[in-house]
Amino acid sequence: INHILNSDKHLNKNVSIYGWVRTFRANRFIALNDGSCLNNIQCVVDFEKTEQEILKKITTGAALNIKGKVVESQGSQQSIEIMVDKCEILGGSNPEVYPIQPKKHSFEFLRENAHLRTRTNTFSAVMRIRSNLSFAIHEYFKKNGFYYVHTPIITASDAEGAGEQFRVSTLDMKNPPLNNYGQ
């Protein structure tokens, strides 16, 4: 969605996009977001040509694959929109229980729904920033001759009693160094 919104090369061309429904207004306008940018892309559905069963399943939080043509928008809120040729429901969402609505939620509320919080503007922005920072750091070190090494992870967890904890130390535990007092 980010590439489509920020480039004219898709104008008057057919595209296929995936995302989650932020809003669905008047059985016609879908605001779709995939987390790649803050803005939603408006998808215009011809409700006379679209099956009623599909229209009923387009609810906030539903995952869709939209195929259609990118055109200049008739409205003033966005510069382009997608005229939907085909809409496929990849994952439904029950509007009665889907907790993320098009409003601002508290961080406490989002902690309680951690599996969905990346669908909010705040957390998707944090994810994009972290991704760009990590990439920049890795790129810097790569350009300066460093290697990225996956070190072993040593943890204190014992899954199902199948192992025993062991101590990792640089000291000789049978003959530890003593201080001036013999301790």
Language model features by range: what are they?
Residues I1-Q183:
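Class II aminoacyl-tRNA synthetase catalytic cores and aaRS-like
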